[in-house]
Amino acid sequence: MSTRNCQGMDSVIKPLDTIPEDKKVRVQRTQSTFDPFEKPTNQVKRVHSENNACINFKTSSTGKESPKVRRHSSPSSPTSPKFGKADSYEKLEKLGEGSYATVYKGKSKVNGKLVALKVIRLQEEEGTPFTAIREASLLKGLKHANIVLLHDIIHTKETLTLVFEYVHTDLCQYMDKHPGGLHPDNVKLFLFQLLRGLSYIHQRYILHRDLKPQNLLISDTGELKLADFGLARAKSVPSHTYSNEVVTLWYRPPDVLLGSTEYSTCLDMWGVGCIFVEMIQGVAAFPGMKDIQDQLERIFLVLGTPNEDTWPGVHSLPHFKPERFTLYSSKNLRQAWNKLSYVNHAEDLASKLLQCSPKNRLSAQAALSHEYFSDLPPRLWELTDMSSIFTVPNVRLQPEAGESMRAFGKNNSYGKSLSNSKH
């Protein structure tokens, strides 16, 4: 059985040893006079997607990623910390450390609330890591119940500190604590929240690009929050091309594995499908153990080896060589992950997310309207962006148990177990 590593705190993917040296991700640190916190002056033309289509993102042929962080202060309120002051917070304990940042549990000295302090180390000759600039500039404008809240930005000579709301665990740790698959009601609520957050950022032309259980925070009330936007990309931020080494291997879509750099919001939707299956089945959907070739073989074993009929354009992708891959026929997903058959409409939704051809993947907005969610309270679709789903009566997490999926059975519905709650 494959195991997860829930300890990673990096915004940048730690390259696998099997990835060639020339393909590994490098952290770019640059300086210029550009202010990433200023609202872009150019207007982004709204993209109208047809049917369930994802939104395509075009890259710039001339733009360069070279901003420099300036100290930024936001208006404070009587219950908020004084923004921009390092002495407003107390470090309590280290939560994790990555290649360029250390994350601490902290506390506001002004209001006593717990926070997460992401302390990014700066080197004068190298400037500020662009991943940190990207994360701060994007999160500053995102206000949604299912996206981690950025409270404050503190810039000193030695460090850049991003102050986030404190959320006590993540989905990776949650699944490790409850092995064997999560309670199906909880899977549904987690997935609904994930899609809410993604729909919000996708409508604002932002890709997350690093969806994995470690980057989905879970509060003690069951709120799921998208976090770690270090690899996120906004259409208004110019770049030459997107790196094809941006998503942890297990959650990386086949088009990216095959070298495509023509990204759309469909990139994130593959990760949603992988996480959905993992929550239900209790194991990663495609736990590659060797390299990109092995990862693709695991995908094709279930979904079938693609060709021009099933995936138009696949032969033009840089790394697609038909002779490299075993010829597999596609299967019903329940043959690979039997617990999908225990929950009404789960297999159908998973099959529409896990499409090799990115153009065939369901968008986040369309997925929210899938029949899988039909037994949820209608008020969930009427919530404002900042409203938690748990403000709706009778919406709450259920107790987890190792055998929850077996006890649940095939014929139970979401509403039958709402009355029994651990909260």
From Swiss-Prot:
Its main location: membrane. GO terms for molecular function: ATP binding; cyclin binding; cyclin-dependent protein serine/threonine kinase activity; protein serine kinase activity. Its EC number is 2.7.11.22. Gene3D superfamilies: Phosphorylase Kinase, domain 1 (3.30.200.20), Transferase(Phosphotransferase) domain 1 (1.10.510.10). Residues 49-64, 410-423 have a biased composition (Polar residues). Residues 89-373 form the Protein kinase domain. It is an enzyme of class 2 (transferase). GO terms for biological process: cell division; G2/M transition of mitotic cell cycle; regulation of canonical Wnt signaling pathway; Wnt signaling pathway. Keywords: ATP-binding, Cell cycle, Cell division, Cell membrane, Cytoplasm, Kinase, Membrane, Nucleotide-binding, Nucleus, Phosphoprotein, Serine/threonine-protein kinase, Transferase, Wnt signaling pathway. One of its GO terms (cellular component) is nucleus. ATP binds at residues 95-103, 118. It is found in: Cell membrane; Cytoplasm; Nucleus. It is a peripheral membrane protein. Serine/threonine-protein kinase activity is promoted by associated cyclins CCDN3 and CCNY and repressed by CDKN1A. The modification Phosphoserine is found at residues 32, 49, 88. Residues 49-87, 403-423 are annotated as: Disordered. The active site is at 210 (proton acceptor). InterPro entries: CDK (IPR050108), Kinase-like_dom_sf (IPR011009), Prot_kinase_dom (IPR000719), Protein_kinase_ATP_BS (IPR017441), Ser/Thr_kinase_AS (IPR008271). It comes from the Eukaryota. It catalyses: L-seryl-[protein] + ATP = O-phospho-L-seryl-[protein] + ADP + H(+); L-threonyl-[protein] + ATP = O-phospho-L-threonyl-[protein] + ADP + H(+). Found in a complex with LRP6, CCNY and CAPRIN2 during G2/M stage; CAPRIN2 functions as a scaffold for the complex by binding to CCNY via its N terminus and to CDK14 via its C terminus. Interacts with CCNY; CCNY mediates its recruitment to the plasma membrane and promotes phosphorylation of LRP6. Interacts with CCDN3 and CDKN1A. Interacts with SEPT8. Interacts with 14-3-3 proteina YWHAB, YWHAE, YWHAH and YWHAQ. Belongs to the protein kinase superfamily. CMGC Ser/Thr protein kinase family. CDC2/CDKX subfamily. Serine/threonine-protein kinase involved in the control of the eukaryotic cell cycle, whose activity is controlled by an associated cyclin. Acts as a cell-cycle regulator of Wnt signaling pathway during G2/M phase by mediating the phosphorylation of LRP6 at 'Ser-1490', leading to the activation of the Wnt signaling pathway. Acts as a regulator of cell cycle progression and cell proliferation via its interaction with CCDN3. Phosphorylates RB1 in vitro, however the relevance of such result remains to be confirmed in vivo. This is Cyclin-dependent kinase 14. The gene is CDK14.
